[in-house]
Amino acid sequence: MERIKLAEKIISTCREMNASGLNQGTSGNVSARYTGGMLITPSGIAYSKMTPDMIVFVDDKGKPEAGKIPSSEWLIHLACYKARPELNAVIHTHAVNSTAVAIHNHSIPAIHYMVAVSGTDHIPCIPYYTFGSPELADGVSKGIRESKSLLMQHHGMLAMDVTLEKTLWLAGETETLADLYIKCGGLHHDVPVLSEAEMTIVLEKFKTYGLKA
């Protein structure tokens, strides 16, 4: 895809993310794999004012193009692309329910078969590290190898998939599951979960399930 077209899709994803309630203000960030690196949202610019020329290219060694400042979380995005070469888009948000669960350092267990959208039988929560730090990038790298969506303790949520559209869908499903987990009382006591055997069946069925385009 041409750079300008991909940059436009990144911006439209950001705006849809905020409009749907998955994020607030400029706290989240979005990227897409691009030849030799990635395109990522810039630091501190409102999505309503963002234009394609503001989207920043960062090469696969972590060097941003001259004159532009990428999101403060560019390290976690780059770590994701290195960890999952088959996936092409990353969305990080401070979605309220996902963040609430993450503050308690809870993973989301198999409370509903839709947990399988993550590619595994739970949605993990990685330990807290300072935002923008190499330690956080390392934690995200380990977590994303296990699951396509994850929670970040005292921070937020991250999702990764093959396209921006699928990644936004995955982020939305993760937030819904976090909401269900809270409403089931999962922050304060054990909740019923599906068996490992059932989740194995569901995961197999999910190989052909989900957003098709």
From Swiss-Prot:
GO terms for biological process: L-methionine salvage from methylthioadenosine; pentose catabolic process. Keywords: Amino-acid biosynthesis, Cobalt, Lyase, Metal-binding, Methionine biosynthesis. Disulfide bonds: none annotated. Binds 1 cobalt ion per subunit. Can also use Mn(2+). Co(2+) binds at E73, H92, H94, H155. This is 5-methylthioribulose-1-phosphate/5-deoxyribulose-1-phosphate aldolase. Its EC number is 4.1.2.62. The record marks Y113, F131, Y209 as: Plays a key role in the stabilization of the transition state and positioning the aldehyde component. It catalyses: 5-(methylsulfanyl)-D-ribulose 1-phosphate = 2-(methylsulfanyl)acetaldehyde + dihydroxyacetone phosphate; 5-deoxy-D-ribulose 1-phosphate = dihydroxyacetone phosphate + acetaldehyde. It comes from Escherichia coli O45:K1 (strain S88 / ExPEC). Uses 5-methylthioribulose-1-phosphate to yield 2-(methylthio)acetaldehyde and dihydroxyacetone phosphate. Can also use 5-deoxyribulose 1-phosphate to yield acetaldehyde and dihydroxyacetone phosphate. Part of a bifunctional DHAP-shunt salvage pathway for SAM by-products. It comes from the Bacteria. Pathway: Amino-acid biosynthesis; L-methionine biosynthesis via salvage pathway.
